[in-house]
Amino acid sequence: MTRYDEKKQLKCSFCGKSQEQVKRLVAGPGVYICDECIELCSEIIEEEFEDTKIDAEVSEIPKPKEIKEILDQYVVGQDAAKRSLSVAVYNHYKRINSDVKTTDIELQKSNIVMLGPTGSGKTFLAQTLAKILNVPFAIADATSLTEAGYVGEDVENILLRLIQAADYDIEKAEKGIIYIDEIDKIARKSENPSITRDVSGEGVQQALLKILEGTLASVPPQGGRKHPHQEFIQIDTTNILFICGGAFDGIDKIIQNRIGKKSLGFGAKIESSKDKDVGQLLKDILPQDLLKFGLIPEFVGRLPIVVTLQSLDKKALVQILTEPKNALVKQYQKLFEMDDVLLEIQDEALEHIAEKAIERNTGARGLRAILEEAMLGVMYDIPSMTNVEKCIIGKEVIAEHSEPELILNENRKSLKKAGAKRTRVKKESVS
């Protein structure tokens, strides 16, 4: 109820001061609040908000060993890459949470470039890191970017994806991770600067420099091109971690040529290119090799941490199919389980899936496609069959696209009764 004093003047419902004693009274449904009480409430809320903000900032960052242990649960192999990424990410977020303003030492940002063949796990590693740290994550394709003023996407659209991933919470987005894929595709065509305009190569590298280093960027809220009569979202990229990935096809030859040039003279040990595989050569990469490949010096300078990934062999691909928490085989078993069917994929079948992926040169990325091809028929039929208890995938199902073996239970609806009759059949004999 509205409160009045003895002179029937309006009073604050909280502190009791009259209209004459305060600067302003704000009316609510049956109550009034004065400007002094509003200010006091504002201070209380701000103090509580600051406390929660400080708690969030100093929240414990996982140690490099802890980050790697979590990565091991999801990513098979690539131990050297996981160690490098764990240290780099730990140092990055330690830098954000540290009170650098109180010291004379400025901790600079260290972005990451990942080199590795297709399907070696570059994108998945970046996604898993963001999941571990619980920060917003966005993926961009470098091939769709062009220099400002040309047909294609502006580099600021990358930041819009991160803002959207953070539900438009700018403060949260400013501590996120952006993965730029196919970064090798924006290399300039030759090591020497071009006299012609390269809007999708060197031009994009130049456009990315500022946001990689750290700047206050203006992002169009609806994406697309900027124009002078629209509002922009302001975002500071200083604390955003950029991870750039690419296959860098052919860079192994650049490294080999550099190493080969040192092997001159009578006493020199000469190594042929066959002595080292691509993965081993990538371990010897230097910034000058990236320059030779076509990245400009300023761009390479903003990606000081170089992480290399190895090609996945047959053993690693089989492990990827079965061991991680979200392994493909476990995913398919879960799908079949939803139809009350057990799925068994035999070891010989798993090995043949890995061999096919190596033949296709698709790495881990191609494993799902191979499984889908082989199991499309049975996944189409089983939901309509009420008496299937188990599905067994052998090598011939993968190699020859033959039908899997099904174990039927003719009395499926009364399985709890003793002696339920079970039969083994090939899928062709099931109507």
Swiss-Prot record:
<dbReference type="GO" id="GO:0051603">
    <property type="term" value="P:proteolysis involved in protein catabolic process"/>
</dbReference>
<feature type="binding site">
    <location>
        <begin position="117"/>
        <end position="124"/>
    </location>
    <ligand>
        <name>ATP</name>
    </ligand>
</feature>
<feature type="binding site">
    <location>
        <position position="34"/>
    </location>
    <ligand>
        <name>Zn(2+)</name>
    </ligand>
</feature>
<dbReference type="GO" id="GO:0140662">
    <property type="term" value="F:ATP-dependent protein folding chaperone"/>
</dbReference>
<feature type="binding site">
    <location>
        <position position="12"/>
    </location>
    <ligand>
        <name>Zn(2+)</name>
    </ligand>
</feature>
<dbReference type="InterPro" id="IPR038366">
    <property type="entry name" value="Znf_CppX_C4_sf"/>
</dbReference>
<feature type="binding site">
    <location>
        <position position="37"/>
    </location>
    <ligand>
        <name>Zn(2+)</name>
    </ligand>
</feature>
<keyword id="KW-0479">Metal-binding</keyword>
<feature type="domain" description="ClpX-type ZB">
    <location>
        <begin position="1"/>
        <end position="53"/>
    </location>
</feature>
<keyword id="KW-0862">Zinc</keyword>
<dbReference type="GO" id="GO:0046983">
    <property type="term" value="F:protein dimerization activity"/>
</dbReference>
<comment type="function">
    <text>ATP-dependent specificity component of the Clp protease. It directs the protease to specific substrates. Can perform chaperone functions in the absence of ClpP.</text>
</comment>
<dbReference type="InterPro" id="IPR010603">
    <property type="entry name" value="Znf_CppX_C4"/>
</dbReference>
<protein>
    <recommendedName>
        <fullName>ATP-dependent Clp protease ATP-binding subunit ClpX</fullName>
    </recommendedName>
</protein>
<keyword id="KW-0067">ATP-binding</keyword>
<dbReference type="InterPro" id="IPR046425">
    <property type="entry name" value="ClpX_bact"/>
</dbReference>
<dbReference type="GO" id="GO:0005524">
    <property type="term" value="F:ATP binding"/>
</dbReference>
<dbReference type="InterPro" id="IPR004487">
    <property type="entry name" value="Clp_protease_ATP-bd_su_ClpX"/>
</dbReference>
<dbReference type="InterPro" id="IPR003959">
    <property type="entry name" value="ATPase_AAA_core"/>
</dbReference>
<dbReference type="InterPro" id="IPR050052">
    <property type="entry name" value="ATP-dep_Clp_protease_ClpX"/>
</dbReference>
<dbReference type="GO" id="GO:0051082">
    <property type="term" value="F:unfolded protein binding"/>
</dbReference>
<dbReference type="Pfam" id="PF06689">
    <property type="entry name" value="zf-C4_ClpX"/>
</dbReference>
<dbReference type="InterPro" id="IPR019489">
    <property type="entry name" value="Clp_ATPase_C"/>
</dbReference>
<feature type="binding site">
    <location>
        <position position="15"/>
    </location>
    <ligand>
        <name>Zn(2+)</name>
    </ligand>
</feature>
<comment type="similarity">
    <text>Belongs to the ClpX chaperone family.</text>
</comment>
<dbReference type="Pfam" id="PF10431">
    <property type="entry name" value="ClpB_D2-small"/>
</dbReference>
<keyword id="KW-0143">Chaperone</keyword>
<dbReference type="GO" id="GO:0008270">
    <property type="term" value="F:zinc ion binding"/>
</dbReference>
<dbReference type="GO" id="GO:0009376">
    <property type="term" value="C:HslUV protease complex"/>
</dbReference>
<dbReference type="GO" id="GO:0051301">
    <property type="term" value="P:cell division"/>
</dbReference>
<comment type="subunit">
    <text>Component of the ClpX-ClpP complex. Forms a hexameric ring that, in the presence of ATP, binds to fourteen ClpP subunits assembled into a disk-like structure with a central cavity, resembling the structure of eukaryotic proteasomes.</text>
</comment>
<keyword id="KW-0547">Nucleotide-binding</keyword>
<dbReference type="InterPro" id="IPR003593">
    <property type="entry name" value="AAA+_ATPase"/>
</dbReference>
<dbReference type="Pfam" id="PF07724">
    <property type="entry name" value="AAA_2"/>
</dbReference>
<dbReference type="GO" id="GO:0016887">
    <property type="term" value="F:ATP hydrolysis activity"/>
</dbReference>
<dbReference type="InterPro" id="IPR027417">
    <property type="entry name" value="P-loop_NTPase"/>
</dbReference>
